[in-house]
């Protein structure tokens, strides 16, 4: 079936040189480079790729450890005494992302559907996910492919994968209150190893996809933690849910047909059903992003285009 054809594991390495150089691999990358080689991922592109990336960034792992550390150890705010509570009611939280469900954005979605009709026809026919849902998800994720992330996906994941000890993110660790205590150092070390192993799996999946799709690893944009493409898949999701929407034998999430087919395949495999209630459909969308406002916005934007959720 065209929609679920996966890229061959024996795909050729990219024939382009991209922005690679042929210098020496910086020492900070060598453990990661050797690990990839030991896991059977060596190739003529690998040395040049690592030689072209400078040194690892502290930011991806540093941001994540700071987030986890703050959640685990920051003092909890004291409850407000009844006598000092404000008398005016708090402003309710928005149910949808502000500024998304507008007449202008509805027209952008409709124009995108018209311009890519065959891709949405195929995805809807194959996976049963309405085109208004698919285009609304693409709009929320990447504004229909116009904003694909500010980071470089391969460099981000490689930096995280290579950051296994606190010294690798020393600038961030120094800013964490109490981080010099032995038990906190042990906590940081353990979390870094866990996140490094996670990033390594994503990096391996991304490298395989880059080799099959022919994308330039150094130029590929991504989110702050390595999600890629119009539909913002983490690389390991490509192997599970990536779909070849244009029949060229590879999954390239930077093409509209593959991105639309892949996100529709994802929703279908997570239980999308035409007969489901609106609440059940919202639950399926939340497997893509777990917060209510995300699912509410996608459903609301789809309904503004004429989709009836139940």
Summary of predicted features, one role per range:
Residues 1-222, 226, 231, 236-310:
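Cell-wall glycan-active module
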């Amino acid at each position: 079936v065209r929609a679920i054809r996966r890229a061959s594991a024996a795909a050729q390495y990219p024939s382009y040189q991209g922005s690679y150089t042929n210098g020496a691999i910086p020492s900070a990358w060598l453990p990661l480079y050797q690990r990839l080689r030991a896991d059977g991922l060596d190739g003529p592109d690998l040395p040049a790729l690592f030689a072209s990336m400078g040194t690892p960034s502290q930011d991806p792992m540093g941001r994540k450890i700071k987030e986890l550390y703050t959640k685990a150890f920051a003092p909890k705010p004291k409850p407000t005494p009844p006598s000092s509570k404000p008398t005016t009611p708090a402003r309710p939280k928005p149910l949808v992302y502000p500024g998304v469900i507008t007449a202008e954005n509805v027209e952008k979605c409709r124009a995108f559907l018209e311009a890519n009709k065959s891709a949405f026809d195929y995805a809807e026919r194959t996976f049963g996910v309405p085109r208004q849902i698919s285009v609304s998800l693409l709009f929320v994720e990447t504004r229909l492919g116009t904003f694909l992330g500010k980071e470089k996906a391969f460099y981000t994941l490689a930096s995280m994968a290579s950051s296994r000890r606190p010294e690798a993110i020393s600038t961030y660790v120094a800013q964490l209150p109490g981080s010099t205590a032995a038990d906190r150092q042990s906590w940081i070390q353990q979390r870094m190893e866990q996140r490094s192993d996670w990033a390594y799996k994503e990096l391996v999946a991304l490298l395989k996809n880059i080799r099959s799709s022919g994308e330039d690893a150094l130029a590929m944009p991504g989110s702050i933690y390595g999600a890629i493409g119009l539909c913002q898949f983490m690389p390991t999701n490509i192997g599970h849910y990536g779909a070849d929407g244009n029949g060229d034998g590879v999954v390239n999430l930077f093409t509209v047909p593959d991105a639309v087919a892949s996100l529709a395949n994802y929703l279908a495999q997570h239980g999308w059903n035409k007969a489901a209630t609106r609440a059940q459909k919202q639950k399926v969308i939340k497997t893509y992003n777990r917060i209510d406002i995300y699912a509410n916005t996608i459903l609301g934007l789809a309904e503004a285009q004429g989709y009836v959720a139940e």
